[in-house]
């Protein structure tokens, strides 16, 4: 039985709640001592993990819709992507304001360059910003064939973000490894498309070098 448009609308409502409830919990935890001994790090890791969860969920939609024969599920992909960007922005903001502090924001650029794991993080955020900004149907029509080329960069984020997470923790625990493993699995489901993209980029680079 296929999902109806009305059911997908209710599913979107549930996904909005899934994006909002972690924020409400975080606010409660901050005000009621629900965080650990290092609340700043806890906030950073919580916001980053939540962004990663929405990224993985967005990547899951296409294969799930295909294998379950539920084409209307695709309509939830943009929503998941926007929540991923929202949480990634909270993640970046928590680092800038809580780790560096308002008086040291001038150091942010230096930090992003000199710390490789932060470099990977900011590259991922910039890509997500571009994808969020161009996620509307009007931008899709305006960009034409370039729209899909741009949104293929989500696969780069799926590589960089788990590495950023693994690199940022001082002690490797199962959690970042699980996220990395899930990202690898979701990318493996698209190996034909990724191989095609790689061959196309390699061909374009070869043609430019030959000029």
Curated annotation (Swiss-Prot):
Domain of life: Bacteria
Name of one Pfam family that matches: Ferric_reduct
Required co-factors: FMN; heme b
GO biological process, one term: protein repair
GO molecular function annotations of the record: electron transfer activity; FMN binding; heme binding; metal ion binding; oxidoreductase activity, acting on diphenols and related substances as donors
UniProt KW keywords: Cell inner membrane, Cell membrane, Electron transport, Flavoprotein, FMN, Heme, Iron, Membrane, Metal-binding, Transmembrane, Transmembrane helix, Transport
UniProt-listed InterPro entries: Fe3_Rdtase_TM_dom, MsrQ-like
Family according to the record: Belongs to the MsrQ family.
Subunit structure, interactors included: Heterodimer of a catalytic subunit (MsrP) and a heme-binding subunit (MsrQ).
Role according to the record: Part of the MsrPQ system that repairs oxidized periplasmic proteins containing methionine sulfoxide residues (Met-O), using respiratory chain electrons. Thus protects these proteins from oxidative-stress damage caused by reactive species of oxygen and chlorine generated by the host defense mechanisms. MsrPQ is essential for the maintenance of envelope integrity under bleach stress, rescuing a wide series of structurally unrelated periplasmic proteins from methionine oxidation, including the primary periplasmic chaperone SurA and the lipoprotein Pal.
The name this protein goes by in its record: Protein-methionine-sulfoxide reductase heme-binding subunit MsrQ
Organism: Escherichia coli O6:H1 (strain CFT073 / ATCC 700928 / UPEC)
Gene (UniProt): msrQ
């Amino acid at each position: 039985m296929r999902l109806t448009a009305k059911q997908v609308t209710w599913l979107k409502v549930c996904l909005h709640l899934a994006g909002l409830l972690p924020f409400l919990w975080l606010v409660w935890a901050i005000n009621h001592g629900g965080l650990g001994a290092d609340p700043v790090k806890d906030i950073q890791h919580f916001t980053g993990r939540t962004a990663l969860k929405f990224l993985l969920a967005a990547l899951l939609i296409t294969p799930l819709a295909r294998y379950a024969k539920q084409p209307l599920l695709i309509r939830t992909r943009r929503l998941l992507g926007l929540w991923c960007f929202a949480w990634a922005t909270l993640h970046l903001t928590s680092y800038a304001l809580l780790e560096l502090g308002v008086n040291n924001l001038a150091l942010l650029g230096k930090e992003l360059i000199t710390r490789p794991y932060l470099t990977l993080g900011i590259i991922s955020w910039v890509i997500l910003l571009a994808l969020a900004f161009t996620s509307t149907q009007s931008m899709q029509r305006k960009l034409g064939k370039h729209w899909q080329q741009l949104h293929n960069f989500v696969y780069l984020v799926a590589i960089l973000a788990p590495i950023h997470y693994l690199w940022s923790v001082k002690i490797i625990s199962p959690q970042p490894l699980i996220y990395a493993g899930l990202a690898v699995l979701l990318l493996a489901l698209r190996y034909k498309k990724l191989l095609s993209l790689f061959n196309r980029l390699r061909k374009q680079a070869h043609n430019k070098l030959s000029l």
